[in-house]
């Protein structure tokens, strides 16, 4: 199982490459050295998240979004059958948000993700669980459960739900609240 949290601060100064190589640890015995297969897997994981040129950089010098992509690469290097994501696109520019979700979807493994962006969730998730105050309100396919009424009830905000003319996917536009 791989995990990508939303907060990934460290006190130790590891290179990006070493951070991703740590994803190989579950596959090793105590003191077992890295091998050719590990190097290839780490390189491919860095390539997937577009960070191969960052290999020698210090993890501590990276932006929040870059750190998030390193942590995803580390999880990919683990070769998990299941991935837990806690706001995986929290610090990312839009380009990388889309890239991260596309990468995760391409892994074809089980994923449990906590997301607040309902349009992204509707686009990339097969099943949604809508939670309010720690309780499951409803669950199902995004196009079956995400309604204006549900969003108003759970998030206390008005919205319009429409089909994105570019992607053909469900999208949600929120109405600005008046204060």
Task: Please annotate each region the language model reported.
Residues 148, 153-179:
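ABC ATPase nucleotide-binding domains
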Residues 83-87:
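Catalytic Walker B motif of ABC-type/P-loop ATPase nucleotide-binding domains
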Residues 21, 36-54:
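Conserved ABC ATPase "signature" region
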Residues 72-73, 100:
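Hydrophobic anchor residue at the start of the ABC signature
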Residues 79:
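Conserved catalytic motifs of ABC-family nucleotide-binding domains
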Residues 58-62, 66:
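Conserved ABC ATPase signature
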